[in-house]
Design a protein with these regions (language model features):
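Alpha-helical scaffold segments that form or flank carboxylate-/histidine-based iron centers
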Residues: 9-15, 93-103
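Generic C-terminal helix-cap and adjacent flexible tail
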Residues: 118-122
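Amphipathic alpha-helical dimerization/coiled-coil segments
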Residues: 28-76
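Heptad-repeat amphipathic alpha-helical coiled-coil interaction surface used
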Residues: 61, 68, 75, 82, ...
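Basic, amphipathic "hinge/linker" alpha-helix immediately C-terminal to the N-terminal HTH DNA-binding motif
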Residues: 12-29
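Short, small-residue-biased leader/transition segments that mark boundaries at the very start
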Residues: 1-5
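Acidic interhelical loop/turn segments
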Residues: 79-98
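Alpha-helical structural elements of signaling/regulatory helical domains
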Residues: 55-59, 87, 91, 108
Length: 122
């Protein structure tokens, strides 16, 4: 890693780091390794879901409501973050793509929870 200092006028100096050639090779190696690995989606709340049958209906509903509420908070945060960064030119396309991916997953989980609640309550 190499560092250089850029003068920013009245702003404090900013350190800018760049990779050495060896660092770049290692970075690319790691990127390729990770991109070949199986994709795992582990959701902490699935431990709750698989054990809901061990709880009373009231507690099941409470757990699902809690998960649903947490998902709403996440979705709202992502909406705000996307709106904030959408107009910024320095945000890479790939960064925005990951935010939209997370939002899409949050929407899908929100729909899934709603359908699970209907199944449990029927």
């Amino acid at each position: 890693r190499q560092m250089c200092i850029r003068d920013r006028g009245k702003m404090p100096e900013k350190s800018v780091y760049s990779l050495t050639e060896k660092g770049k090779q290692q970075f690319e190696k790691l990127m390729l390794e990770i991109s070949c690995k199986p994709i795992n989606i582990f959701l902490d709340f699935n431990a709750v879901i698989v054990n809901l049958d061990s709880m009373s209906r009231e507690r099941q509903q409470e757990c699902l409501d809690n998960i649903e509420s947490s998902m709403e908070v996440l979705k709202k945060y992502l909406e705000e973050n996307i709106a904030l960064k959408k107009s910024k030119e320095d945000i890479p396309v790939t960064g925005m793509a990951v935010l939209r991916q997370q939002y899409t997953l949050a929407e899908a989980i929100e729909e899934w929870i709603a359908s699970l609640k209907k199944e449990i309550n029927s």
